[in-house]
Amino acid sequence: MSNIEQTLSIIKPDAVERSLDNEIKEMFKNKGFNIVKDKKIQIAKSEAEQFYKVHETKPFYNDLCAYLSSGPIVVMVLEKENAVLGNRELMGATKPEDAAEGTIRKKYGISIDKNSVHGSDSVENAKIEIDFFFKD
């Protein structure tokens, strides 16, 4: 029995600013992901605060929210078997210098903050995050 899942991926401002969104989308497609929905948007800091609410008590929370709302982002719903784990593997470690060769963050990430992509960390959070950006 297949385990087709959906997950949310965000191409963050640093990557969009460098016009890497199409290259990153190709990386997903080459790994068998179907991009079900995608849109380029700019969110307000208050929306970023709501999105990252789970990190509210962490010291990096304000910087994270300011960064996500600092420029256009591309939000996508990705679908494939075991999509959540597959996306996490393709993104690579949070710190680009710790990420494995061939991962998005190793290839395009600048720093722990400007690491080019976000991905849902669980099936449950994927549902919540997809609903956050695609309420239809």
Segments (PLM) and residue ranges:
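Non-catalytic terminal and connector segments of soluble metabolic enzymes
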Residues: 1-136
